[in-house]
A protein has these predicted regions:
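Extracytoplasmic
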Residues: 339, 415, 419-594
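Formylglycine-dependent sulfatase
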Residues: 25-390, 401-427, 432-434, 472-473
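Bacterial N-terminal signal peptides
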Residues: 11-24
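N-terminal secretory signal peptides that target proteins for export/translocation
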Residues: 1-10
């Protein structure tokens, strides 16, 4: 079993092969700038790979990236999804950029921030993202507004349908085909095939092994009755079927990573493509993670430590390279722009550091630093040796990566130094507070604006379909006093086509609903009735209690409504209720007409 503090076994890899590879690939590197492919797993722990010693799972394709390139010994991300994605995209701590959470608008990356895609786009690259965005749904938070020429996937932080899912392509609704990770990979490969003659960035942020627990049958059959040898640190908290499903999803993810790597090789691109792989936070359930404490949502090692694998065969990253200084998601933007030899777009100072001297074995002095983590009011600082938590605990991660012993009392000077640094960092970060940013509507360059239930507020007896706002819908609309509101800011005065994604029991059809914004009010009749059953065949295991069970929503063509420029509440209410309920509401779409 591998201990998370050591990668000694990896050092035995045949480094001599690297000289031959570099010689063979030198010509290719000189011909054009490198392509960049970035894989991000969702809720995968450090221990979810055969490379890190997990004998429960087999991940040869992901492992091959590590074996052919560099491995970061201690790489840190955030406790939750959206903050990590924001830090990767910008090279800056998420708290600086408006990212305060994972839903209800808290996930949005401030519009004055520049992303990695902005930099590569400005340098002449074609840029594409395929998967879970999770940094804003409306323009100018949308990926097409953040430097990506092509986008296919979903912008929410959680998705409730993993088979034939409703997705979007560049802001327009589409229907995916098959299992979602396979479908996202299909589109990423098509993008690579279409643009292989010029430099490209392909960002593939998967949404697995994040729940719901749904995986193709052939993968589940591998794990359904498989003994789980390596267990969570606290086996009593581990739900073995959830571990099996998460690992089945990991093997599917590995299959899809392998598909991309194979296509790069077939197109003659693998040698001059920088390939990056990491995860956005720790595992979503207690399962084997090298003995580390904590899971997703924690600032402990298990919550924020991820693998980081980087490969560039033609660029000087030698197989067997191990990055021993602590690293973080904030380092990837400066590193990738440096490796590609392009300038960074944007003037705001970076928090991350360029790792290319470590990757390329340059004799550049490396100054030790601290890396900081935040989850709500809990914060933590990490040095090359220690973890200091805002509660006052200190752990020696070199001798005790499992955090089994608090050594604060034995190291008062270290505690003082790290507490002071953490306090200064916290004072520098904006405070966590209620997000007061409205949802922008009606940008002329992106006329369709989705307003999902996630971004609205229910009033009266209306409630969400489950506790987690992401991928929820409004239910229990029974009273004339009930309403739903969205805080919007209309950018362009004009006529808007209004669509409502709804379901309604057939006997309840006929209610009259009203939509109001400032001085504009329009009404419509809820018809026809449409009451599909909840999907029963998508899930491999029961959903966690906070996740909504999904169904097929239809579009109610509400009509056209004139919206004046300005900020206000978009309010949906009923003027007449024809039956027991009005309808369930998943989303309102507002499309600016010419």
């Amino acid at each position: 079993m591998k201990r998370p503090g050591s990668l000694n076994a990896f050092a035995h890899f045949c480094v001599a092969l690297s000289a031959l590879l570099l010689l063979a690939c030198a010509t290719a590197a000189a011909e054009r700038p490198p392509n960049v492919v970035i894989f991000v797993a969702d809720d995968s722990g450090w221990g979810d790979y055969s490379f890190t010693g997990n004998t429960n799972v087999h991940t040869p394709s992901i492992d091959s990236i590590a074996q052919s390139g560099a491995v970061a010994e201690r790489f840190y991300v955030c406790p939750l999804c959206a903050p990590t994605r924001a830090e990767f995209l910008t090279g800056r701590y998420h708290s600086r950029m408006g990212v305060r959470g994972v839903s209800t608008g808290l996930e949005r990356l401030n519009v004055d921030e520049k992303t990695l895609a902005d930099s590569f786009h400005a340098a002449g690259y074609v840029t594409g993202a395929f998967g879970k965005w999770h940094n804003g749904s409306q323009w100018p938070y949308h990926p097409n507004a953040r430097g990506f020429d092509e986008y296919y996937g979903f912008t929410s932080g959680h998705w409730g349908e993993y088979f034939d899912p409703p997705l979007e392509r560049n802001g327009k609704p589409v229907r995916g085909k098959g299992f979602i990770a396979d479908d996202l990979t299909d589109h990423a490969i098509s993008f690579i095939e279409m643009h292989h003659a010029r430099p490209f960035v392909c960002y593939l942020p998967f949404n697995t092994p994040h729940s719901p627990w749904a995986v193709p049958k052939e993968y589940w059959q591998r794990f359904r009755q498989k003994p789980i040898g390596l267990r969570a640190s606290d086996p009593a908290r581990e739900r073995l079927d959830e571990t099996r499903c998460a690992l089945a999803m990991m093997e599917n993810l590995d299959f899809n990573v392998g598909r991309v790597l194979k296509r790069l090789e077939e197109l003659g691109l693998s040698e001059n493509t920088i390939v990056v792989y990491f995860s956005d936070n720790g595992p979503n359930t207690p399962r084997w993670n090298g003995g580390m404490k904590g899971i997703k949502g924690s600032t402990d090692e298990g919550g924020v430590r991820s693998v980081l694998f980087l490969q560039w065969l033609a660029g000087g990253i030698r197989p067997g390279t191990v990055i021993r200084p602590i690293t973080a998601a904030i380092d990837l933007l400066p590193t990738l722009t440096a490796l590609a030899g392009i300038s960074r777009v944007g003037e705001k100072p970076l928090d991350g550091r360029d790792l290319s001297p470590l990757l390329l074995h340059k004799n550049t002095p490396w100054i030790d630093r601290m890396i900081f983590s935040r989850q709500d009011a809990r914060t933590a600082a990490r040095s090359q040796r220690y973890l200091y938590k805002s509660e006052g605990a200190l752990f020696d991660l070199v001798d005790d990566p499992e955090q089994s012993k608090n050594v604060a009392s034995a190291n008062p000077n270290v505690v003082s130094q790290m507490a002071r640094a953490l306090g200064e960092w916290r004072r520098e970060m904006p405070s966590i507070e209620r997000d007061l940013r409205p949802y922008p509507v009606g940008h002329s360059e992106f006329p369709r604006t989705p307003l999902p239930a996630r971004d609205g507020i229910p009033h009266g007896t209306v409630r969400r379909s489950a506790g987690a706002p992401n991928c929820s819908y409004f239910v229990n609309w029974r009273s004339l006093e009930d309403r739903m509101t969205w805080d919007i800011d209309v950018q362009t005065e004009g006529d808007y086509e209004v669509e409502i994604l709804y379901t309604c029991p057939v006997p309840d059809a006929g209610s009259i609903i009203e939509l109001n914004f400032l001085d504009s009010t329009e009404s419509a009749v809820v018809t026809p009735g449409w009451d599909p059953p909840l999907y029963a065949n998508q899930d491999t295991l029961p959903r966690p209690p906070g996740e909504s069970k999904m169904k097929e929503f239809r579009t109610l063509p509400f009509g056209t409504m004139h919206l004046e420029e300005g900020r206000g509440l978009l309010t949906l209410r009923a003027r007449k209720i024809a039956g027991r309920t009005v309808m369930d509401v998943r989303q309102i779409n507002l499309t600016l007409t010419e």
